[in-house]
Amino acid sequence: MINASLLKNLIREPIWADSVGEVCLAVDFSEANYSSDEVIAISAWLQRQPVPVIGLMNDNEQILEALDFVADTELEVELLASFIGQHRQASAVLVQVTRVTMGLPVIAALTVESLGYATLQGGEEFSRWLSRQKKTNVGGSNISSPVLMERTGTELSILLNSPSNRNALSVSMRDGLSEAFSLVAMDDSIKNVVVSAAGSCFSAGGDLTEFGVSKDVAEAHRIRQLKMPAQYLAEHPGRYSFKLHGACIGAGIELPAFAGHISASRDTFFRLPEVAMGLIPGAGGCVSIPRRIGRHRTNYLAVTGMKLSVEN
């Protein structure tokens, strides 16, 4: 970890990571005292770095917005650096995407997320994760209608109806949700949309048995642009209420985070496991979650993969 004074000299090197080969940059800002011009220059330099930037902070908020992670102790810095080192490709793409998307319109931000996801689909970390998966299932669910809709007056109820598959975002579930959310976008007479799920949990995220099926990452990006539910949901957040329970993993929280209102039962918990798979949140989470809880917390949840209970 370098100190705040040394950083003023480091910024003479445009891309610091290229010269030292480090997987992340950790800086102790606890005693930083920069002029306004120095804050601007250092912030711009930090955001240009292709590796995650961790800041050890006390009450000093001068450089806060330029950081990818904020730590309170040196031990926390070491922990974050360890997680990043285990998945350096995915961690780097994650922070690059969340840096950019915060300043973009939602639909443009979703495109950036999909491009980052596609990049990692062709990467060594994801390939390594795939090689460790047991191919014991053909995936999906045998339920013919994984998404059910019922309208009462101006309210539309949408039910994730694949409990045997823990309501995983399979291709059929994805397409069903896109159809439902698209209907809402086209029908102004639908004033309220309530989304809930059958079974023991809201959604366990992507259907792992379908991961790696598409070998053409450019085509996979094209399909996401056409089919991902987030693009329809994100345009009308105020009309949506999500009722969550049990596991909300990956897409199981990435999509609800777009909604204007979320309620959760006491057994609800959240996780973003994608970085450990060599990927980034790809169902809209790099866009929806930072807008809800901030970029630092989103990056932390994604890189550590920690389980967050509803009490937290």
Name the predicted role of every residue range.
Residues M1-G103:
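Ordered, small/hydrophobic-rich secondary-structure cores
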Residues A41-L46, A180, Q225-H236:
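Catalytic-core regions built around general acid/base machinery
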Residues Q96, S200-S203, I249:
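Short, active-site-adjacent cap segments at secondary-structure transitions
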